[in-house]
Amino acid sequence: MPTSNVPLDAAFWIWGCVLAVFLGFAIYPILTLGPYIRAGCRINIHRNRIPPDNKVRQPNPNGDAFVLFLSGVGRVSALTMSRREQGILHRLAELCSDAVLLDDVFAYSINNLPLVSHRRLSPMWRWALRQKLKKRLHNSALGYLINLRNILHILISADSRYAMVYNRGCAHVITDHLQQYGYDLAQPKPLVIVSYSGAGQIAAGAVQHLSDEYRLPVYVLMLACFFTASGIDRASHVWEFIGTTDQAYRFCLLFSPSRWLIPRLSLWRRLTAAGRTTRIDMGAMKHTGRGGYLDRNSVTPEGVPFIDATAQAMADVINRIRIDTESPKEA
């Protein structure tokens, strides 16, 4: 019997790949949240205590504030901080010596589980991390699979269909982590969440539950962050640190209409009008890399390295929060 072979041209494979990607994006939130929902929104939180690094992750029973740093989308675990991020953390620890500074929360996991261990796909993520750390262009491009995966979690946090469940899980991770360092939920101290880039959405989503469910006084510092306004209104105050040459921030802002100041009913506009948001101009700083907020080689017109200027601006806000929250007690 004669058979006919139907030729499969390039369009077939292109549309097939597009459909596969679309279906993958559609079911990914369900795969991510399914185990969490089946467990009654209470699952085992992965704990991996990391030894103190200088004054970072150093328990302090007399600390008058807790500062939690959430990293950008390139992170795969609580252990993989970039040198630039480590640099600003050490500077903040020196400038805010009376605060407990923490950085070992993996913001892109609903149970704090790192990508590179205790997962079925851990070998793939370890391979992707190795590729990302290589200097050759084609290798590092493959490593950006990590960024894509973490961006999907940012989108889940911002999606109203999944946000309530996902963000509540992130809030549980944060409170569990704080208690490991002596934070008393019954007598809460100021919690300052410092977010970089995409982690801003994770922080914004968790704020609602940290405030409503745990009654914590939460302050948020956004370093060139992408986030929606939903939930952030529960924060006591929000500071945005933005450079004039940060085009990545401005591009992503286009996809967050809840933060546009033009609509009359914009939540972000109402928060701004109420004096609960502050924008701090960081000068001619870019989003990342050379000339970025954490660059130690580029300097301000006054001759201060960008990373030092960023750390000082953040430390000024953190120390102001500490002083303002102590004043009523002393009175």
Residue ranges and their predicted role:
Residues 208-216, 232-241:
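Short, surface-exposed basic-aromatic patches at helix termini and helix-loop junctions that form
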Residues 63-65, 99, 187-190, 216, ...:
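Short coil/turn segments at beta-strand junctions that form active-site/ligand-binding loops
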Residues 221-228, 243-247:
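Active-site nucleophile loop of the alpha/beta-hydrolase fold
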Residues 194-199, 203:
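Gly/Ala-rich beta-loop-alpha elbow adjacent to hydrolase catalytic centers
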Residues 17-20, 27, 33-47, 68-187, ...:
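Active-site catalytic motif of lipid deacylating hydrolases and related acyltransferases
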Residues 1-65:
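Intrinsically disordered, low-complexity regulatory segments
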Residues 234-329:
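Lipolytic serine-hydrolase domain surface
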